[in-house]
Amino acid sequence: MHYKQYLVVIPGIVLAFVLYTLSQGFNNILGIELLGYEKSPISTAMIAILFGMFFGNVFKMRENFIKGLEFTQKYILKLGIICLGIQLKPFEFLEFGAIAIPLIIICIVSVLIVIKLLVKKLKIPTRMAYLISIGSTVCGTTAIMATAPVIGAKKNEVSYAIANITVFGILSMLIYPYFANFYFDANPTFIGLFLGTSIHETSQVAAAGLIYDQQFNSPETMNVATITKLIRNTFLVIMIPLFAFLYNRGQSKGKNYSILAIFPYFVLGFVGMIILRNAGDQVFLSTYKEIWINTVQYIKASSKIFLTMAMAAIGLSTNLRDLKNMGYKPFVVGFIGMATVGVVSILTIELYINFLS
């Protein structure tokens, strides 16, 4: 009986993997071959969810795929988030931490306050507000995917939030490098801090840094932007349990409530991967360097595959009519969230510049 229960999820998992493969291939053609980037600035996860939504709404999904798609969204997603921790090396961030961490905290708090006020004004669903908030402040689609299961977000809410964050992330990726060069008078450190705190996705930050480097010959800017963004990504460890607590406390309405019941324990696996990476760098780089580097790269690649498969599964399970019914208001919140994090980042960096002078 148990053996058959495992077999029933295989078709859906395979379908999600096939869609990941198609999405990755399409992204390589679009971002590398056509646009000419060394690495595509477009999120493969976003392409996967769009492909999934297309196929899922054009063709009727067969019953034998459903359980596997649900398994992918629930468990393979969490496995991908756990593996994501292997790419974070906080001990290397100490040099920029004194500047970047306060800046990141101020940006996060400011956006959360603004979005909370907008939610009351525009009356959008609480889950949607949480998804847009964490996507705008921490690390884009990855943060949305990680937060969705702990607040019980619906598939259409996840799809909408990811589309929201991706659109505004790409806009800021294309505009901010040129704006920052003008505003910060070509200072590589301040421009890097601004790009790293104001653009949603890690891939978009890297692309913005690359655009700036190619346009203004400043590799230092790209390095500062990337490090700042990775520091920002580590806040996922704090924000997911916090959002789980706040959301579920709000839903309990006076009933008995336990943080242990809703704590996202996969976050512990994420933290464990961060510890493993830093411990491994200390122990194995001097003795088994090539093996350790290959292992880290393998886990990184696996994380991207698992997360993109989960997005493909979400897309396949999303009904476009549900997205249409959600209206334009969440996009207004997403735009204002993008503008807020940009303005707050500029003002905070200005204060820092004035302090130094």
Task: Describe each region flagged by the PLM.
Residues 1, 32, 59-61, 88-90, ...:
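Juxtamembrane helix-boundary/capping and inter-helix hinge elements in multi-pass membrane proteins
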Residues 19, 23, 111, 115, ...:
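Alpha-helical transmembrane segments of multipass membrane proteins
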Residues 37-51, 74, 96-109, 133-136, ...:
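Structural signature of hydrophobic alpha-helical transmembrane segments
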Residues 124-172, 190-214, 302:
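Alpha-helical membrane segments and immediately flanking helix-loop junctions
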